UniProtKB/Swiss-Prot annotation:
ATP binds at W364, G469, G470, N473. This is D-xylulose kinase A. Its EC number is 2.7.1.17. One of its GO terms (cellular component) is cytosol. Highly specific D-xylulose kinase which participates in the catabolism of xylose. Xylose is a major component of hemicelluloses such as xylan. Most fungi utilize D-xylose via three enzymatic reactions, xylose reductase (XR), xylitol dehydrogenase (XDH), and xylulokinase, to form xylulose 5-phosphate, which enters pentose phosphate pathway. Belongs to the FGGY kinase family. The gene is xkiA. It is found in: Cytoplasm. Induction: By D-xylose, L-arabinose or L-arabitol. InterPro entries: ATPase_NBD, D-XK_euk, FGGY_C, FGGY_N. It comes from the Eukaryota. GO terms for molecular function: ATP binding; D-xylulokinase activity.
Length: 570
């Protein structure tokens, strides 16, 4: 007899995954449905449809129903005993919204176990599509959101972020303007995460306390929707109507929403006692997969760079994102997203290889060697200026700049900053400089979110975790540790592409097995086998070096402001 099992679902842009763990957090089953490869009847590409004339990107909701049928069938084929499943949670692509019709609750309640979800729920939606995070059709609405409370800083302070095209508030506002009749006939609006939970509950589930922060509507400090922003978003239908559509938001991320709907008991053999737990967003689920403790930092080094941190400090800024932590009251998730990441590093790598006549140009060996041979900030002697640069092959959002390259020399003794005048040995000096540039930006923007780990040691993360392609690179790891610190070191995380589903599954384990008042970090931390997932790859805090980079952060901030001024952005 197997012990209890838990499922975490991950509904992303290109696939739905169901991952099953036991109480010891061991993965026992995985079932995937790839939208492009496995779906029938949808003219999608990479999971979405586009209307380029209006910059719209969206997914057919019926596709997700087909995918859930497919994933559950996949688990059945693997011989999983559904009666062992004790709890279900999920992770959804953030910001996406689902528009339910007036008959949705009735259709959800009356599901016939002999038929698929797709056959029965196709008519449950007032609008057949869900806007995707790649959608950029809402510039007008974003401008109005940014102005509503006085400016971007005020909006960021209230909701954790300035207005973004993909955020649900601006999307709903545009929806009610574009489709006023459909909006009136919409009974409820779900996020992708609460949509997953609704399907299993057999009625509309509330939104999750963390994912609700990706809407530009939730006032994080007040713990309630912001009336002014609701008013702006709702248009002529009014605030009360929009509040009804959105529903209440429970504060406990581990609340038991209710038992699984009898449809799943009859069709698959789930136990009627299987409990549904709020599903959260994909980024909040990622910090649960670690589990990321307060002051830990995670850097995802893919095509773009994402920085995630769990922190007790709430210090919002228009360039960053704050969300409520998905499980732990009093903590926040801090997030930074950059457009320029891997591509910018690869261009320097290729230039270094070309200069050395190395083929193929895609090998990292020379880039690593040059990076490690170059002294911090390119300073061969203490009296040399620090070499600072911005390297943006594509337009950047943090800070908001066109594509381009800028190089400066900074003197920390007198704080002077000069455009570089031929002192760079290109492209060799750029190898270290580009890694430093990316890491200094992370350190600058996460200032004030960490504590001192001990007597006489400056505030810094406890651990720095690296994930994604760049985490395999020893030179990048070494520079990351020198700049970001990490009192326990820099670790490579081997979680593959399962992070979101794992985090959701762990959330279900915690919600069902916690003692009264037991935090997620405590319960999961005791059971997590870190040696299976992580490997220490570099030292973190190094006295002297960390402090020198602290001076470089000041120069880096000056450089950004100077470039913004030159570009007429400041």
């Amino acid at each position: 007899m197997q012990g209890p099992l838990y499922i975490g679902f991950d509904l992303s842009t290109q696939q739905l995954k169901g991952l099953v763990v036991n109480s010891d957090l061991k993965v026992v089953y995985v079932s995937k449905f790839d939208f492009d490869a496995d779906s029938r009847g949808f003219p999608i590409k990479k999971g979405v449809l586009t209307n380029e004339a209006e910059h719209e990107v969206f997914a057919p909701v019926a596709l997700w129903l087909q995918a859930l049928d497919g994933v559950l069938e996949g688990l059945r084929k693997q011989g999983m005993d559904f009666s062992q499943i004790k709890g279900i949670s999920g992770a959804g692509q953030q910001h996406g919204s689902v528009y339910w019709g007036e008959n949705a609750e009735k259709l959800l309640k009356e599901l016939d176990a002999s038929k698929t979800l797709e056959e029965q729920l196709d008519g449950a939606f007032s609008h057949p599509f869900s806007p995707n995070w790649q959608d950029s059709s809402t510039q007008k609405e974003c401008d109005e959101f940014d102005a509503a409370l006085g400016g971007q800083s005020e909006l960021a302070f209230a909701t954790g972020s300035k207005a973004h095209h993909r955020f649900t508030g601006p999307q709903i506002m545009r929806f009610q303007r574009k489709y006023p009749d459909v909006y009136k006939k919409t009974s409820r609006i779900s996020l992708v995460s609460s949509f997953i939970a609704s399907l299993f509950l057999g009625h509309i589930a509330p939104m999750d306390i963390s994912d609700v922060c990706g809407m530009n509507l939730w006032n994080i400090k007040k713990g309630a929707y912001d009336e002014k922003l609701l008013q702006l978003c709702a248009g002529s239908s009014g605030v009360d109507d929009l509040k009804r559509k959105l529903g209440d938001v429970p504060e406990d991320g581990g609340i038991h929403l209710g038992p699984i709907d009898r449809y799943y008991v009859e069709r698959y053999g789930f136990s009627p006692d299987c409990t549904i737990i709020p599903a959260t967003g994909d980024n909040p689920a990622t910090i649960l997969a670690l589990p990321l403790r307060a002051s830990d930092a995670m850097v995802s080094l893919g095509t773009s760079t994402t920085f995630l941190m769990s922190t007790p400090s709430y210090k919002p800024d228009p360039a960053t994102h704050f969300f409520n932590h998905p499980t732990t009251a009093g903590l926040y998730m801090f997030m930074l997203c950059y457009k320029n990441g891997g591509l910018a590093r690869e261009l320097v790598r290729d230039a270094v290889n070309e200069k050395l006549g190395e083929k193929p140009s895609t090998s990292w060996a020379n880039f690593d060697k040059v990076t490690l041979e170059t002294p911090p900030m390119g300073q061969k002697a203490d009296s040399d200026p620090m070499k600072l640069g911005l390297f943006f092959p594509r337009p950047e959002i943090v800070p908001n700049l066109r594509s381009g390259q800028w190089r400066f020399d900074y003197n920390p003794k007198d704080g002077s900053l000069q455009p570089s005048n031929g002192g760079w040995d290109e492209p060799f000096d750029e190898a270290r400089a580009i890694v430093e540039s990316q890491m200094l930006s992370l350190r600058l923007r996460s200032r004030g979110l960490t504590q001192s780990p001990g007597e006489g040691i400056p505030a810094q993360p406890r651990r720095v975790y690296l994930v994604g392609g760049g985490s395999k690179n020893k030179a990048i790891a070494k520079v990351a540790g020198e700049i970001l610190g990490g009192s326990e070191g820099v670790y490579k995380l081997e979680i593959g592409d399962n992070a979101c589903a794992l985090g959701a599954a762990y959330k279900a384990v915690w919600a069902m097995e916690r003692a009264e008042g037991q935090t997620f970090e405590d319960l999961i931390g005791k059971r997590w086998h870190e040696e299976e997932f992580i490997e220490k790859i570099a030292d973190g805090y190094q006295p002297g070096v960390f402090e020198r980079y602290g001076q470089a952060v000041e120069g880096f901030e000056k450089m950004e402001l100077e470039v913004l001024r030159q570009e007429g952005k400041h």
